[in-house]
Structure formats: C-alpha cells, structure tokens
UniProtKB/Swiss-Prot annotation:
It comes from Arabidopsis thaliana (Mouse-ear cress). CDD domains: crotonase-like. Involved in peroxisomal fatty acid beta-oxidation. Required for wound-induced jasmonate biosynthesis. Possesses enoyl-CoA hydratase activity against short chain substrates (C4-C6) and 3-hydroxyacyl-CoA dehydrogenase activity against chains of variable sizes (C6-C16). Possesses cinnamoyl-CoA hydratase activity and is involved in the peroxisomal beta-oxidation pathway for the biosynthesis of benzoic acid (BA). Required for the accumulation in seeds of benzoylated glucosinolates (BGs) and substituted hydroxybenzoylated choline esters, which are BA-containing secondary metabolites. One of its GO terms (biological process) is fatty acid beta-oxidation. The active site is at E116, E136. PROSITE patterns: 3HCDH, ENOYL_COA_HYDRATASE. Its EC number is 4.2.1.17, 5.1.2.3, 5.3.3.8, 1.1.1.35. Disruption phenotype: Reduced rosette size, twisted leaves, and abnormal and sterile flowers. GO terms for cellular component: peroxisome; plant-type cell wall; plasma membrane; plasmodesma. This is Peroxisomal fatty acid beta-oxidation multifunctional protein AIM1. The gene is AIM1. Widely expressed. It is found in: Peroxisome. Gene3D superfamilies: 1.10.1040.50, 2-enoyl-CoA Hydratase, Chain A, domain 1, NAD(P)-binding Rossmann-like Domain. Its main location: other.
Amino acid sequence: MAKKIGVTMEVGNDGVAVITISNPPVNSLASPIISGLKEKFRDANQRNDVKAIVLIGNNGRFSGGFDINVFQQVHKTGDLSLMPEVSVELVCNLMEDSRKPVVAAVEGLALGGGLELAMACHARVAAPKAQLGLPELTLGVIPGFGGTQRLPRLVGLAKATDMILLSKSISSEEGHKLGLIDALVPPGDVLSTSRKWALDIAEGRKPFLQSLHRTDKIGSLSEARAILKNSRQLAKKIAPNMPQHHACIEVIEEGIIHGGYSGVLKEAEVFKQLVLSDTAKGLVHVFFAQRATSKVPNVTDVGLKPRPIKKVAVIGGGLMGSGIATALLLSNIRVVLKEINSEFLMKGIKSVEANMKSLVSRGKLTQDKAGKALSLFKGVLDYTEFNDVDMVIEAVIENIQLKQNIFKEIEKVCSPHCILASNTSTIDLDVIGEKTNSKDRIVGAHFFSPAHLMPLLEIVRSKNTSAQVILDLMAVGKAIKKVPVVVGNCIGFAVNRTFFPYSQAAHMLANLGVDLFRIDSVITSFGLPLGPFQLGDLAGHGIGLAVGPIYAKVYGDRMFRSPMTELLLKSGRNGKINGRGYYIYEKGSKPKPDPSVLSIVEKSRKLTNIMPGGKPISVTDKEIVEMILFPVVNEACRVLDEGVVIRASDLDIASVLGMSFPSYRGGIVFWADTVGPKYIYERLKKLSETYGSFFKPSRYLEERAMNGMLLSESKSSRSKL
C-alpha cells in the first residue's frame, strides 16, 4: 500500500490545530507539501475555532528539508519557476506573522528547510537526540527559507555562522542550551507539551516571540563585523573556489545592518542565483550520483538478498591490510589478520591499534568503542582460523605468482560459500584466479589508502563473478561506511586507470621546462587536494616505478616515459616514506618544496630532450590544468567506451571519492561536459600534433565532439560488467 503524501490538519477540543507533514521517509518539503502547508496555515488562521497551531512531522521525523529532486529538475530545464515561493509567502506571512501562535514539535530531525520552518514558529519543543542543522551549502546554495536570518537571532552570530558555513548539525540537547529549542521533553510528550505551549502563548502565559525581529543575541555592530570578518577568512580557507560561502556571509550581513526582513529578501534573491551556478549543479549531481551507485543491473534487481558477513580474514598486514582490518573492526565485524612471520604480524597488529588510537585522539571514536573493536581482532600465522570466515580479502604486494598461490590455498581451507576477494589495484582478476575452481567467488575489493578513512570501495567484477558475491560485497561496503562502486575488470579498473595519465602529464610538463612546484600549485588551486608531484611523494615513488611497466604493457601507445622517478629513487628520495621526495617532510611541519631536487629534474630534462629548441615552454595556468586533466578525461572516455562502469555518474563519484576530484565540479565526466567535449577534443588534437600520441583524442571523445553530444549522454553497447 502506498504511503500517503501530503499535509493534514486536525483541530482538537482544546482549539489547537495540529498540522502534520507526511512525506516518507524524512518528510521532505516537496512542492505538494509546500502547497499543502500554505493551504492548512491559511485555513487555521481563518478558522474561529482555532486558537493556536502546532506543526509536526509524521512518523517521528519533523522534516529533512527541501526536496532535492526539485534542484535536479531546475538544472535540467533551467526553469527557476519550478522553485516554489516559500520564504516570504509561507514562512514570513502565514507562519511567523500569524496572529495565532505556532509551535514546532520536533522529533528525529529538522534539517535545512525543516529547521527553517521550525525557526519561523514562535516556540520549539523537541525530543532528545533530534538532529538540527542547515546543510544547504553542501549543495552549492544557501538556506533559502530565512535560515540565514533566524539562526543568528536564536543562537548568536558566531555559533550560527559556524553551523551554516561548516554545514554542522547539532543535537536538540545542544540546541536547548543555545536557545534554539525552548523545551526538551521525552518523545512521548512532544505533541502534548507543544499543544500546551501554544495555548500558553495564545492566552498570554508565555511570550509571543518572532525570531526574525529578535536582536538580543546579535551583539553590537562592531562585534558582528568582527565575527563576519573571521567567517570570511574561514570561507576563504575551506571553500576558495565556491561562491555559496561568501554569498551566505553577505546575506547574513545584510540582515544585521538593514534588519531581518531585508535579509530575507536578499537571501531569496541570492538563493535563486546560486541554484543555477555550476557549483550547485556539480554538487547536486554528485549527491544523485552517489545514490545511483546502489543500483546495479542484474545484481540489485533480481530478488537476491545479501548474506550476513560476520567474520573476515585479511591476508597482509601492511598499510592497506591494516587499514582494511580497521574499517571492518569499526563496524563490529570480526577480523583475522594473517601474516607470513611474527615480526610482520606484530607490525600489522600495531598498525591497527595505532589507527584506533589516532581516531580516539581526534575525537572520532570513544575509548570504549575502540576497545570493543579490538576485542574482535586476532592475528594468525596460518590458515587454521579460516574455516569459518565469510570472506577473505587478500592485501599483499602486487606479485602475480604470490597472489595466485594464495588464492589456490584459501580455496582449499575456506568454506564453499566464502567470498575470495583481492585488493589488487593493477593485476587482472582473471589472472589471479586462473588456478582456482571457484572463479564465481573471486571478486576485486579495491580500497583506497588509508583504507579506514577513504570513502570509496571499487568492487571489481570479472566475467565469472556471481551476482550474489557482488551484492554481498556491496552490503559489506555500506556496513563499513564506504560508497561501493561496481566496475569491470581491466588493468587499473576505473579510478587508477582513468587517472594514470595524471602524473604522466605532469612529468611531461616538467620535462618541457615547467616548474614542478608551480604545476602542483595550479592543480591544488583548481581544487584537488594534492598536485601530481605531492601525490607521488605521498604514495611513495617505489610504487610508481613498480606499476609503470604493468600499465605500459597494456596502454603503451599513450604513455609518456620519463626517467625522473628512477632518478629520484636513485638519489635516495622515496617521498614522505623517508622524509624526502620533491618536498622535504619534517615531523610537525608542513611539507616544503626542496630546491635541491631541481638538479634531478634538470638531469631528467636532458635525458628526455623534448623541450622545443632546448628551451622551456611558456604556459598559462589554464593550459597547465588542461594539459594535466584533459588526458584524464580522454582515458575516462575509453573507460566509458569499454563499459568498465555502469554509468558515467559512477565514474564521477569514483573520481570524487577515490581521487579527491573536487565535488563542486561534479566529477571528472560532469566537469568535462561542463567544459565541452568539442573544446577538449580540439585542444587534445592540437596538443597531440605538437607533443605526440600521449594527447591523441580517443574515438569516443571524437565521436561525441563531432556529433555535439555530452560524454555522459550515451552508454557504450560494450560492457565488462
């Protein structure tokens, strides 16, 4: 039976009209809900038998905020009229300016537009542990129902700017201390207390307070300006390329200088401008792209149910293995960690303990929970504990023969239902499992380092992997708070393959005479957290040197070969691992560019000898971004063409979560579509004419450029899934 969506009103014998929002699961404020609220508030205000009003959400949730689907519709059509009028017509006129008091009965959550409705009420009664916040900036917009004006007046300017700029939610308990919540009562008493409170206001026993007109928590103008100055510095630091943070501060300032209602009008104007910004389009796209990853054709739509995974064995206790073990333990999954000798095993155990300790010291985990997690952990040197595990994750070095032997051994000792997963990032799954008889149970579980912190899990499906195994691993991914993205089997899979040109393009530029520290600076200014040389230092240059030949074997027609990494290692520089790479790493301080590395770069330039006329090329920052990232887009096109991902948006979310491509740019494919396939094709064609096949446009990119199509528009008929 379909759940009813709408707004209802019931008037009790006490004269209180209870208006209820019903839109499962979180009572989001879709257009029909907003229309219903307007209708019911008009009705309640006009009826003589109504003394006061209580606003509540159905099924123990007040409201999760405005319906994000509307943003998506606006982005597709460019039609702002799809955005309903809420801020003035409903929130100000019908609710806050109502002659009859309105009390919000808050349970579960009041987020975004939900909290904004609650703040327009004349009082707020809440149950404990309700979640309160204004997360709109994470979608590229600002609060649009008066939140920029009312929150500072209820909790103070400093706390309000902190909550809004950082999209930080608080509990109803904290809200009560701050004055956002007027009364905190047991869940069963929220409605009855709200009714009584509303009547007490109506009959003069409690004050009739309009949040928009309060000034008692704003402070003096000079104090407000000092807080806003700090807020601008914070915005510059956390969101240098995004407009919504600075716009939000401007709107808050408008209300402080010219009054709350003036601020509301400015907020509505700025909100509409931001809705159509590239930033909002990118962030909303990422939101829906993440949702879409949970739908995998012929896996999630064929009636299968995930099997419980209660015990997992991890083989290899290095950086990756210990991180994977940590992630599993944090979700109360028993873990057996296997190593080849006692020394390596102790290192692995200590790494897991250090991960837990770090989370506790940063306030991300309580000591009790860390202790409970570690009680589920056991280290072993043989396979005796493997007979009852539900899954094995192999996380040893990238050695084909070693991995083949491990899979042959675990097939013998594990139960027939056990999932056999590899964390390989470069080796073909079919090759790893070719000596086994259990090819349907073999799957890639590619975590990103550090595995207990990075949010992406690439689930790699070979031509033999069963749908049940994929579904089981997707469930495990969600249980350990990862975003699982199912991809096809190829060298590098989706993320590493798409981004392998990233460091190569940077090496080409450096060998063409461009300053490598400038390259890193330009790329971080674009929005990636690390430039290509910083990333190389972080990963360790030994890894780059080891995987290079694997990629060259398969993708050799479009690789740039540079001696720079080898020269770096020969000079004793392995990056952050040993304190020196392109940068100097000292404990307690930020990495510093190492000028002495330039002699190595110069040697590499002489050996490659690609500078035109022996002189460094001159490039703009824009050209650096294009020469680094357009080859990445080009490889993304090949990934799409070969059907390595189910949909283009899967590659977007994988690029954001796996390579930290800026979410506000929507992911690598979305960004490329924003720039324009034709422009990218023409630039790559020109670059290939000057610098060779590394930049040669792919067939997929050329087709879309010539036909005026977006890269995301058409899925390849080929599939590796």
